[in-house]
Amino acid sequence: RAIGKAEEELGNGKKLYCLGDIVHNGKECNRLQQLGLETIDHDTYNTLHDANVLLRAHGEPPSTYKKAKENNIHIVDATCPVVLHLQERIRKEYTADTEHRKQIVIFGKNGHAEVLGLVGQTEGTAIVIESPEEVERLDMNRDICLYSQTTKSLDGFRTIVEYIQNHISPDATFKYSDTICRQVANRMPHIREFASRHDVIL
């Protein structure tokens, strides 16, 4: 989706920036660079005015869109629809909790672009846990709403859910949303089986 949007914009002769690598594939990034796509970071993005910028599938926090309005940046939004829906759910949960009594928890990798976009929906207040072992950081006497980065392990998510269910106070509520992308999750058994038959995978 992101590649198609980039090719369309570049094919129309427009100068196009991409906020971060468009895909995790150096060869494809180089091909698009030859077509005119320029990859930038957030520091460079914040200095742009009157430019066209593509947002990749991982999504962005609200601050990125705010800066676009301020600097007259045209956004070509290639955010994955699954990620957009997840952002909206987290944002609604956060804004509905006016007294900020709930812990909004995201099972994900700190610093990952998707996770930064999700945390941004909560004005930076969401708690990120990278592994089931970190679930002990949560306050089991307070309400918990659990979400997941779309590409995390389904087994890890289930382990976290089970731990919270077994330890949360009777006076607190626990809600969770399995937001793991099935296209990714369904690949994992095949990848494990494939890996078991080979010594090295490039």
Language-model-detected regions and their locations in the chain:
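The feature marks the mature, well-folded catalytic cores of soluble enzymes
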Residues: 1-201
